[in-house]
Every structure is written in C-alpha cells, then in structure tokens.
Amino acid sequence: SFIWLQRRQALQINGMNRELETANEFLATLSMKISRYLSPQIYKSIFSGQRDVVIQTERKKLTIFFSDIKDFTATTERLQPEQITRLLNEYFTEMSAIALKHGGTIDKFVGDAMLIFFGDPESRGEAEDAAARLRLALDMQHRVAELNVKWRNEGIEHPFRVRMGVNTGYCNVGNFGSADRMDYTIIGAEANLAARLQSIAEAGHVVVSYETYALVRRMIEA
C-alpha cells in the first residue's frame, strides 16, 4: 500500500542518513589525524579550499628561524633511548606551542633541529613578522631554561642547550617533491643563512642577521 511504501522509503532515508553521519565522523577523525603531520596554517588552507595540493612554489620574503641542541649527539650517548625520546618530545611540544602562539609556520623537525618561518601562508607585514620571530626565540630560550631546571630535578645532569639563528630574506615557498609525495617547505640561500647563523650561536643565545636586525632594531634597543 501507499503508506507501507512511505514507511519503507523513510526507513531507507534514515539508514542512508546514518551511513552519511558515520562516514562524516570517520572523515573528520581522519582529517584530524592527518592534521598532526602539517602545520596548522597549511592544514587550514588546504582543507578550506584556499590552496591546491599541487607542485607549485612562489617567491616570498620570509623571516626564517633555525634551532638545534648543541652537543645533542653527546647527550644521546649519556641517556637511555627512552629518556632522550621523552625529553625530545617534551621539548618539541613546548617549542611548537610557542611557535603557534606567535603565528609561526612549523616547517619540520630534523633530528634535534627545528625550522620555522613567518610570512607564509599568513603575514602581518615584514617588520611584525620579524618582531614575532624574535619574540618567539626569546620565549623559547626562557622556556628551555625552565625545562632544564625541571629535568635536573629529575636527575638529568646535562639537559638541552639550545642555539638559534634568525634571518629575513626571499625564499621559494610551496610544495616540493613529486605527485605521489610532497613537502610544503622553503628553499633558498636565505634559509641556508639562517641555518649558518644558528650553527655559530652560543648555547642559550640567538644570532640575528642584519636584515632581521634592521626590521626589529627599535625592539632590540628598547
């Protein structure tokens, strides 16, 4: 009868709606898991449709930050693998929170090193990007000092000594790689200079290039 057909259709529609809800929940969960492998700014620009996942780069003026842990190899030799893994993950967790607070784009972790940049995909202007970068570095050094006190109280005799380098200049930024596997990263001489500045910094200090210094001179002198 007609009423029976209506009920049958209603049941079918309800079943389809439940399947769609389940599928949407699965996709939302999967999306959140994938987001852990991307900087939040990049993730949002991709999933909002603002950015295509294609091999494409553009030239932009960025402020680039490199850091690493001085004598990290020697530190790993003094500690058990489980200890160094715990400390490194805690360190990266704290540093990442500071980077995101200041609006930095976390490019990658390489061993004990971090690469972060300002100016893409969001920018507040050259001077403000550079100032945010400097505030980030100072906040990180302060937090590392606090972590070292905590770790010494836990019996870690020689915790992390972090050195940092900051530079401002033009880089190519975007998706590099192949159609099957790509990274959103930066490439260029200015990024290499930031890495070199980090390598000459003393532990617990930040070395800033003249280009960055010129943008934040008033902040430093104040």
Regions found by a protein language model. Name each.
Residues 154-156, 176-188:
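Short, surface-exposed loop/helix-turn segments at secondary-structure junctions
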Residues 110-111, 152-163, 205-212:
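Acidic/histidine metal-binding catalytic segments
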Residues 89-104, 120-164, 189-191, 195-198:
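Alpha-helical scaffold within the catalytic cores of cyclic-nucleotide enzymes
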Residues 42, 84, 91, 110, ...:
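Helical mechanochemical/support elements of P-loop NTPase systems and associated helical scaffolds
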